[in-house]
Amino acid sequence: LALLGVTVASAPLCSRLLGRNAGWVLALPLIIATVMAVSVYDGVHTESTSWIPSLGVDFNIRLDGLSFVFLLLVLVIGAGVLMYSTRYLHHKDSAFYFFITGFAAAMALLVTTDNLFVFYVAWEMTTLCSFFLIGNSGEKGHQPAIRTLLVTVLGGLLLLTATIIMSVSTGTMQLSEVIASDYWADNPGTLTVVAILVAGAAFTKSAQFPFQAWLPDSMVAIAPVSAYLHAAAMVKAGIYLILRYSPLFGEVAIWNILLIVCGLFTAAFGAMTAVTRDDLKELLAYSTMSQLGLLVATVGIGTDAALTAAIVHTIAHACFKAALFMSVSYTHLRAHE
């Protein structure tokens, strides 16, 4: 994470010195971080340091199987997108490299932190980076960026409310301890409320009904942004959230109902809308929405087999959809030559 922080800080300078070729240099730390993650992973790897002692906020890092999978997606696909950008961009763009590396760092923090407050901060950082990356696409991106921000900020408020309730109720800010707390067995009403809030937060991030409109709207962004944020990383933050809390909410009926019903509706709506589109990028946006709906519904089933299938399909979808977005962009460029 420190390496990624240095990468973000150095992105503007690298961009000024190297222009669009800065992507080669900025991709290197992500590759190194991937190697480091693989080398330290031993099933469950934890690190902790005090951050805000007066509030009981520690900087806890927990690398378990779920975190490891999502961290590799963030780092590997992020490195690929940065290298792709060196040939896609036609001019020096310091803002792009700063915010895309900032997004990578925020996502890496989100999937590895074991602290509720830090998780929320990382969640909002991805929202802000997405807003600036979409808005950086020119005048046509300003309104979609604002609409995307409004929807995802709503999800952030839902997550913040859930975070406060969980930390106050259990007396801890450590995510793994919150999930394992005995408090929930004696307070099913509070558990149900938190489950609804967390599901709502995930729906805004992963473009699920009734918050699905922002995803196709945001496709005005350039191809590297669509490939990374809206196919491989940002929309997967919501999937990570529901997978992470699945052990806690798996027996809550409203949780399963929300995920299955909204997920299947989104999957059907996205698929039916996709086949009516003749713009390739728009088609991919709706098909992404459909696939995310299937993932959400699968997590809602809640069995071990279903959760395993959801994780496997998350990996497959992130890889092939990122590649498709970059391929479609190349097709558009050649078609307009």
Residue spans for each PLM region:
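C-terminal regulatory domains involved in ligand/effector binding and gene-expression control
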Residues: 1-3
